[in-house]
Amino acid sequence: MNKLALTLVGMAFAVLPAAAQDFDSDFSFGSWDDFNKVEITSNDKRVETSIKFAFPMYFGTSVLTDVTYNDAWGAFERQYPNFLAMDARKNFVYGIEMVSLHARTGAVDLSLGVRWTFMNFTFRDSAYSLRPEMALGSPRASTQCVPYRIASEGPYDGRKSKIFASYLGIPFRLSLNYGRATVYAGVSAELLMDSYTKYKHPKYRESINGLFNDFRAAVEAGFSLSNFGLFVNYGVTPLFQREYSDAHTLTIGVTLGI
């Protein structure tokens, strides 16, 4: 319930400032060059403001940096060595920005949006996975996520094993536009919406509440030409809860529609 309330507040924060503007009722459906956006625009002599329903998308791969094995995982490192090693080729990241508020003056563009982000992290050793387990020595009933070998649980044919997290966030960007070229830098604040662990053959999926940080902050930069571009994103906050690891994420990929 708290997540829902925070989400609604965040979305309102992104959209409500536009309600204070007197927009011209000018809806336009752009060509592919405008990435099929719907734009509502208000102009004055100095600043142009608009709301865009443009659906820019992000596709990339993510690696873990500054990996540590803290209290909850330190005892398992010898039994499951380097179990946080991930296969970057399969760490797929996808994001879609559903709506954004823009303010432009000359070549400078400020934007505030709402974005869904989906992150998959695939274990390099496909026999490794994580599962909830009752925490030992806890003063009250609680669970923690611990590593284990899938092969020890029954028949397993070595298919990929992964952990998954999805976020709803508010990205803020400062962009400089030069004709069809755009250079931008920004930050984002994101809330964790869902998380689970998954592997195939035998097919298995289980929620892993409490593994990932509930809040994620990131910095981002990118370059695009005619709406096709490259981006890099770094997670300032650790991906996991502090009791597990101080690992951060570094994501690189391509963008469409920025």
Describe the residue ranges of each PLM region:
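Transmembrane beta-strands of outer-membrane beta-barrel pores
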Residues: 59-67, 116-122, 189-195, 227, ...
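Predominantly the C-terminal beta-signal and adjacent terminal strand-loop region
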Residues: 207-258
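Cleavable N-terminal export/targeting peptides
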Residues: 1-47
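Short sequence motifs at beta-strands and strand-loop junctions characteristic
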Residues: 86-92, 160-166, 211-215, 222, ...
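Short loop/turn motifs that connect adjacent beta-strands in outer-membrane beta-barrel proteins
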Residues: 22, 42-53, 66, 99-110, ...
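Flexible, surface-exposed loop regions and adjacent strand-edge segments
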Residues: 72-77, 123-137, 200-206
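Outer-envelope beta-barrel architecture signal
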Residues: 49-57, 106-112, 179-183, 215-219, ...
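Surface-exposed strand-loop-strand hairpins of Gram-negative outer-membrane beta-barrel proteins
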Residues: 63-95
